[in-house]
Swiss-Prot record:
It is found in: Cell membrane. InterPro entries: Adaptor_Cbl_N_dom_sf (IPR036537), MCAfunc (IPR045766), PLAC_motif_containing (IPR006461). Calcium-permeable stretch-activated channel component. Involved in mechano-stimulated calcium uptake mechanism and in mechanosensing in the primary root. This is Protein MID1-COMPLEMENTING ACTIVITY 1. Residues 235-252 have a biased composition (Basic and acidic residues). It comes from Arabidopsis thaliana (Mouse-ear cress).
Amino acid sequence: MSHSWDGLGEIASVAQLTGLDAVKLIGLIVKAANTAWMHKKNCRQFAQHLKLIGNLLEQLKISEMKKYPETREPLEGLEDALRRSYLLVNSCRDRSYLYLLAMGWNIVYQFRKHQDEIDRFLKIIPLITLVDNARIRERFEYIDRDQREYTLDEEDRHVQDVILKQESTREAASVLKKTLSCSYPNLRFCEALKTENEKLQIELQRSQEHYDVAQCEVIQRLIGVTQAAAAVEPDSEKELTKKASKKSERSSSMKTEYSYDEDSPKKSSTRAASRSTSNVSSGHDLLSRRASQAQHHEEWHTDLLACCSEPSLCFKTFFFPCGTLAKIATAASNRHISSAEACNELMAYSLILSCCCYTCCVRRKLRKTLNITGGFIDDFLSHVMCCCCALVQELREVEIRGAYGTEKTKISPPSSQFMEH
């Protein structure tokens, strides 16, 4: 399985790299390492190690050194090793993601092998006798001490274990969808699977040309994984389509009910009174429906320190906090609370120095009503640090969500009537 990685020169055109000296080749490797999307850590470590060598070689006249036979052959060997290293790093960007994932440990072995080979050629070159100064010797010692460790990342190892299982499961499809969305951000999942399948077919053809049976089996297994994931994807799309159709039907039925209510005339004052009470009950139903539909906790729509974005609300809350607190408490408790009641509560708790405790309890009730993430300590610290900012954030959240709670029922008297004699 490993000898196909030894023949990486067949994958890219080596002729394009001929004529480049060691310093330029190192520059190409560093540039390719920055754009690699597989084995990123190994590529960057390898590039950092080669930078040390490149900084040393920049001070030498390589063209002059090639005139001497004792330095020409080691330099040419070093350049050949750097060309193979460039092909290795460049393959971490251009080759199939699944293939690179399956061949992970072989690639790690190649990084170690290339680093040892380059260091071996570097020691053969008699640089110390040509450039005899202490700074060069110190850099040689630093290069000897710089031994990088190449391994497979934990996340890539987990994905490799899931994909290379004997049975194709939905777990493999979900993991594959997550990883391919990162590797192909501009493509849909089906298009990314198609691209990977095409690349895997090319890898399979190359392995068959090398008569590598073990690697062919791995690639065929990866092709099966992509086909299984492609079969799972239409089922999930059908489920999403069904859910969307149900939502559209529900919304259309609500619209028809609303239009019917608008068209129906108001016949009597008693019907208007019953409609006002029904609005109160519908407010209860709306809040309970919102609470039941929330499957997961949500976040605050506004930041705690973003109160200055609405200066008028900030000034109103600073000079008249009771009005703001009354609206928040109404939405939190689902019961109409007037500004006077909120003011009485604030005054009562202020006498025992527990004003912040009362307001943080209101914030906690509001979080539970709107299903927002957080804890009691977060609520307490928010009101201790800046109670005004916390109240502004809570009222803005109520306005954004439209959760005004139960408003006080207003009963209007019937219109005046005249009796004819």
